[in-house]
């Protein structure tokens, strides 16, 4: 077990990338050519529970999948930033919309497009298979 050197009681919002964070790193293709996503049921349970507990949740992704959008809407997430070319802009919009400070936001990303947000948020986290550049920034790392 690892220790996160951060006062978790300060966290009021969670923001996530999708591909590689809330879905597998491998995206199978449907015969039609459309990418198919897999999701973790436990992640979904945790997200809907966080929403019920009053945490603000944002999804900030470069992807544009309607299926993924429906999944998060079904979990109670209303702050969805799809097709995010420069994630820091959407992160700041989310933060400012709710009058949050960077220190009140946990962000989980796994790849280079997430790095700018991870440098700005209060608690940058990543999955264990994140790229090395992201691992150099993170404070908390998932063990799965």
Name the predicted role of every residue range.
Residues 106-140:
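Acidic, Mg2+-coordinating phosphoryl-transfer loop and its flanking beta/alpha structural elements
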Residues 77-85, 124-128:
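Short hydrophobic/aromatic-enriched beta-strand-loop microsegments
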Residues 42, 63-64, 86, 110, ...:
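Short beta->alpha linker loops
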Residues 142-144:
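Conserved small/polar residues in nucleotide/adenosyl-binding loops
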Residues 53-58, 97-105, 122-123:
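Short beta-strand/loop segments at the ligand-binding rim of alpha/beta enzyme cores
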